[in-house]
A protein has these predicted regions:
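An acidic, low-aromatic, low-complexity terminal/linker signal
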Residues: 1-157
Length: 157
C-alpha cells in the first residue's frame, strides 16, 4: 500500500482538551476555531449553554463542554477555544479548554467504547483511539448536539 493510499484510509480529527482529557471530533464537521470572546448570556438557558456569540456574521449558540460533561465551570483564558461545528445546517460553538492539533487516525487505532465507560462525557463517546502513549476519546457530534437541540431551536426562533 502506498503512503497516499494509507492516508486515504485515515480519518482526520481535531484534538482538544476539556478538564485534562483529550477529545477528538471529525475535522470535516469543524467550520472554524476562534478565541472565546464576548459571549452574551441568554436568559433561562440550560447551565451548559454559556450564551451566544457573533461569529463571522452569524449568531452562534455556545455549548460549554466542561459543564455539559459534568465538570466544574472554569474561567476562559488565552488557551480557551470556541470550536464552531456544523450539523444539519446549524452552527454551534463548543467551548474547549484548549484546541491541540489536527491529526489523522487510522481506523484500526480506534476501538468502540467499553460498556463500563460511564459519566456525563461517556454517553457522547463514539470511540477511543490509542495514539502512542495517550488515549483520545472520539466524540459523536450528533449525540452532543441532540442534547443542545432544544436550545438551538429556541434561539433560532
Amino acid at each position: 500500500m502506498t503512503q497516499a493510499n494509507a492516508a486515504q484510509g485515515m480519518g482526520s480529527y481535531i484534538l482538544f482538551t476539556v478538564a485534562g482529557t483529550t477529545y477528538a471530533l471529525p475535522s470535516d464537521a469543524v467550520r472554524h476555531m476562534e478565541m472565546v470572546e464576548d459571549v452574551t448570556r441568554v436568559p433561562n438557558a440550560p447551565a451548559f449553554i454559556d450564551g451566544v456569540v457573533f461569529s463571522r456574521g452569524q449568531v452562534v449558540p455556545v455549548v460549554n463542554l466542561r459543564v455539559r460533561f459534568g465538570f466544574e465551570r472554569a474561567a476562559f483564558d488565552l488557551r480557551s477555544r470556541l470550536i464552531v461545528v456544523q450539523s444539519d445546517g446549524r452552527l454551534i460553538g463548543l467551548v474547549a479548554d484548549a484546541a491541540r492539533e489536527f491529526v489523522r487516525i487510522p481506523p484500526d487505532a480506534i476501538q468502540p467504547p467499553n460498556e463500563a465507560l460511564t459519566g456525563m462525557s461517556g454517553r457522547y463517546v463514539e470511540g477511543i483511539a490509542s495514539m502512542g502513549d495517550r488515549l483520545v476519546l472520539i466524540l459523536s457530534l450528533d449525540r452532543i448536539l441532540n442534547f443542545a437541540e432544544a436550545l438551538t431551536v429556541g434561539l433560532a426562533d
